[in-house]
Structure formats: structure tokens, C-alpha cells
Amino acid sequence: VPKKKKIAVYSATGCRVCEQALADIHYQVSSLTRWAELSFWPYLLGSQWSDLERQAEIDVCFFTGAIKTDSDRQAALKLREKSRLMIALGACAAFGGLPGLVNLAPSEVMKESGEETNAPNSRAQEKGEEPDLPQIEERVSALHQIVEVDYFVPGCPPRQNFLWAAIQA
């Protein structure tokens, strides 16, 4: 019996429609389980960061979303380190997508806008604590601007036949 390929799926900053498109090809996924194992996918499997830390190697990582926070960056770096192949899935991962439009505005305008519209209202802040939120990066980046990417599957979301071809490759 040949060893099953380990597949990871991760979504950074984006709308998660690319992940939904992957999940929507369920009628083909049953054949996938004969030769592949979904080893990390927070959206579908409820995987935690500790699950990723325990894995020695991943054969293929499908990374969706743009890099907008320090946690997005950390995930991209860790998944690249563990993955034999890194695939930028969708327009956000491939090009920055809609989240990347924020790069068109001066950063001070975006900072002021965020500070004005995000009044303190969390339970943590009511207790005098700071919420543990990821830090926003100065600019939104596409995946290839952070790590080496082996393949790009663009689209918003990518077409299902392209998704299935990428999975089978």
C-alpha cells in the first residue's frame, strides 16, 4: 500500500470562500481519501496550531488568504517550513486580492480610521485587560512575498475543475 500524501489547508486574511470551494468538491473527495490524508485544516477539521507543530512533514499545503497580520505571517512561514509543496490558492494568496486594496491608502489614514471606528468595547477591555489580538502588518502581502510558492491557483474562488486538478497533481 503506497504511503498517503499529507495535505494541509490554511486560510489567512480573506473571506474563506476558497476553503468553501475546496469543501464543496465533496463528491470527489471520497476518492481523495484513497491516496491522501487531510492532516491539517482548521476550517473543516477543527485543527489547532499544536496539531501542526506535531507534524513532521506535509506533502502539499493549500494556503488561502492574504498576509495581513503577524499570525498570518507566522502560519505562512511554519507551513512553508513543513510543506514539500506550497500552493497559493485563490486571488488573495496569489495576488493580495481584496484585502490588498488597503495598500492603496496611506497607512496613517488606515490607522486613524481603525482607531476611530474601533472603540474599546470588548469584555477584556472592560476588565482593564488588553485583548490578545494579532498585530496588523504595515502592508498586506501576497503569499509569494513572504515565502517561496511552488504553484498558483488563482480565482475568486478558483474554479472547481482547477481545484480538483491541483489536488490530483
For the regions a language model picked out, list residue spans one by one:
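Iron-sulfur-associated redox domains of electron-transfer enzymes in respiratory
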Residues: 1-169
